[in-house]
Amino acid sequence: MPFQEVSIMDERREFVRLAMQEGANRRELCRRFGIHPDTGYKWIDRGAFDGELGDRSRRPHSSPARTERAIEDRVLAIRDEHPAWGARKIWRCLDWAGIEAPAISTVHEILRRNDRIVAPAGGAVARVRFEKPAPNLLWQMDFKGWVRLGDGRRCHPLTIIDDHSRYDVGLEACADEQGNTVQTRLQLIFRRYGLPQAFFVDNGAPWGDSSGQRWTRFGVWLLKLGIDVLHSRPYHPQSRGKNERFHRTLKAEVFALNRLRDLPHAQQAFDTWREVYNLERPHEALGQQVPASRYRPSTRSMPDRLPQVEYDDGEIVRAVPTSKDYVSFKGRLWKVPQAFRGERVAIRPLSVDGGYGIFFGAHQIAKINLTDPECVGDVSEQVSAMSPN
């Protein structure tokens, strides 16, 4: 798919589609998109009148293409615009356009007859899918493997997918995989789409420490925003199936079809394709509907100031030094993860005799066993045997 620079019209389409979702807070959406409410409501009225973003299954009174030759030309035109799309997606696009499309098998035969079919390398492996019941309960975040650009630099694509709707809330062309880079990109994404309840990530950097520790400064930043960080089981990439599938689609529909010169060029290509993916491309896991049909922005807005963790009166609270990884309790020093240097933590009794937990807000980050001073360390994360897919 040849890319073009994302226009104001593309942003308008996304705004109107999200604003027309049931229960959408339209005034808040105007604020997040940086447009005046009067302008936003005008766009919404035009979108509803034109029907461009309404019920796409509603057919017009007369089909724009009825002849066999015209339908075949339309099938091939869609395929040429989106070379990675198969018969099912093309059939759905014909249906949305109000064209009396032939059977999916006929669409496939049109593609085969016109040399648009490439034999698959092997059969797909069926997997049981799990998903959250509503948008923004879980976002899956990952880096696709880096790609070499025309100027010789590396591009590290950062991908963020809403688990329920498969809506791509973020597709960023990054120069590295550092926590600060991700944090900067997320701030812009949060201001547009709001905050998720949790992120699902793997165990590598920047979500995990290279030394094997679970917590990083980036993760602490998310906790302060009230966002949980869930890690997949080690050596089980299939538990992040939505990310893996998205990465394959990105490779087939962007990298395989475009030679990207540099990072700005890559970001333009990502932005253009992201609009297609969210608003136009039928998704098999969604019954050939588009992700935008199931997504709505979070009601939790990005705060102007980073909230500080609060503790109840009477709790045992300690300040972790900025240069050491210890807090004092009962006359001894107890280790905490390095990521919490300079933060305030609470020490709370656990159900185990003589045991205490060190907490950052509601999250236990380390443990204390007064009967065995040597048995002190970070709390290992309890990962469900059924990780989100």
Regions found by a protein language model. Name each.
Residues 1-14, 61-69:
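Short, Lys/Arg-enriched anionic-surface-contact patches
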